[in-house]
Amino acid sequence: MRYSKNFDVIVVGGGHAGTEAALASARMGCDTLLITHSIENLGAMSCNPSIGGIGKGHLVKEIDAMGGAMAAATDEAGIQFRILNSSKGPAVRATRAQGDRVLYKAAIRRRLENQPNLSLFQAAVDDLPVKGDEVQGVVTQMGLEFMAKKVVLTAGTFLDGKIHVGLNNYAGGRAGDPAAVSLSARLKELKLPQGRLKTGTPPRIDGLTIDFSVMLEQPGDLDPVPVFSYLGRPEQHPKQVPCWISHTNEKTHDIIRGGLDRSPMYTGVIKGVGPRYCPSIEDKIHRFASRNSHQIFLEPEGLTTNEFYPNGISTSLPFDVQWDLVRSIRGMESAVIVRPGYAIEYDFFDPRQLRHSLETKVIGGLYFAGQINGTTGYEEAAAQGMLAGINAGLAAKGKEPWLPKRSESYIGVLVDDLIARGVQEPYRMFTSRAEYRLSLREDNADMRLTAIGRDLGLVDDYRWGVFCRKQEAVSRETSRLQNIWVGPKSEAAPFVSQLLDQDLSHESSLAELLRRPGVTYESIIALGDGMWAPETLDEDLGLAAQISDQVEISVKYQGYIERQATEIARQEHNETLLLPESLDYSQVIGLSKEVQQKLNLHKPETLGQAGRISGVTPAALSLLLVHLKKDLGHTQEAHE
């Protein structure tokens, strides 16, 4: 049976990638359908009840800058907020929030149900009908056909998912949910290159059985209280609660070692590779054998539950070993497990077979986003989902895709890393992955992306108005600081000397003073009882804080940022030089067989992408550039 209505875009999966994809497509005016096996689990935080962190928080800010839901939902559901790396430079400062699972799901579902142009349908998808090389829609488990111009697949860990607890295993997408076995088989029929990855989760603990009095309390930040969304306010936050810190010990490690003979990871039952930066406790004990202790964060799952998430002891050991290892930890001697930890193996598809739009090269109109592409983490999934939803929507309208650059966003870094390099293990974002991270900060994601989002139809009038007000205020205040001068003999000189802890030797603008070590924007405007304070930055105190932060960072780091902008411009030429899809690299004289094979395998779209493939040297790029100019006369056409 065929459904009575056709859609512009169908999104399969209601996790973090799927919800952002569906919302983005619908905001752009596309008639969008989100199909999920469980409407109750839309936006569920399947593992750690937190959003953000180093690199990840940057992605959330970028999603928010373009009108996405994750940051705003976190402001409504976050029960603890912290700024990580607050004492370090602005490039690596990152927001992290502990979330209430129930409140977060409710916030996401409310946005989905109230989004114009978006329909929801509960069903499992088993098939993707393809005509020629173009996807036509989806077919559900009960045989119902939904037709669409474009399809976004965000299947998470559900594709042929297998859950492991000790040597016992069973099919599942996550605890309590079925695996997508038929859909996985269908994708393999389409000859898409596939592999297996693994992730895991710790046992959940009844908080009433934990002795917090012997643990270290970890409160959130209070002055100021962070927010995630550029439109967020601390007043939106629910009740704030602490996390708690404990540690494993030698007894814990002995218990784990004693159970390794029944570990699916260490007996060869699990074949998939797990995330390097979120290892299981078994891996930690094995890889860091000399350490006698590992930190554990006891994180509350929400305000209406007693469950705690012991971050740091993800495990797939048998339940009896989990029970003993938990009870060996200080403060958890009487702890009761309410949900066992487990590992899950699942199919992923090589992201090198994707275009930068996240459309598959093999099947036109089919887009992949999230863990299906080999990533790990809610934030990485949400960023891909938004991008896939945007590009599916643009394609449905007959428009060119939006391809974010590495130099303009962490989303661009993420996608380029996946497509140029592929994955050998679950990929997670770090600030260290971005070569232009001083320009890609949390505080300026809106300055980088909101105008783009507006042009794409993603940003509503209210967000646009607030952004324009902020942008104008930052420009006005920066100019004011550049045009107020103070000399050694001026009335203000004593105040400046006191601030600098030395005499002012020459005339300086306030902007120049702000660039000095230890000088802040707040200290400048407080001089002489506020003689240089602006009349007002904005009536909205939250926006005023954003403005002052933006002014201080842009002024203080102006020289570094300008040098980075020059470097970006220099790289742009080769970065955007298009490579013909039909180019046979074995015909490029001078390239080694290895490089020829890698280029023919990956089929990079631009010279910049080619340069990020492992083993492709600058010398190889020079030979390729000569070939393009000499044999193809391609240089001019590449930029048209």
UniProtKB/Swiss-Prot annotation:
Keywords: Cytoplasm, FAD, Flavoprotein, NAD, tRNA processing. GO terms for cellular component: cytosol. InterPro entries: FAD/NAD-bd_sf, GIDA_C_N, MnmG, MnmG-rel, MnmG-rel_CS, MnmG_C, MnmG_C_subdom, MnmG_C_subdom_sf. Its cofactor is FAD. NAD(+) binds at residues 274-288. Transmembrane segments: none annotated. FAD binds at G13, G14, G15, H16, A17, G18. It holds the Pfam family GIDA. Coiled coil: none annotated. GO terms for biological process: tRNA methylation; tRNA wobble uridine modification. It is found in: Cytoplasm. Belongs to the MnmG family. PANTHER family: GLUCOSE INHIBITED DIVISION PROTEIN A, PROTEIN MTO1 HOMOLOG, MITOCHONDRIAL. Homodimer. Heterotetramer of two MnmE and two MnmG subunits. This is tRNA uridine 5-carboxymethylaminomethyl modification enzyme MnmG. The gene is mnmG.
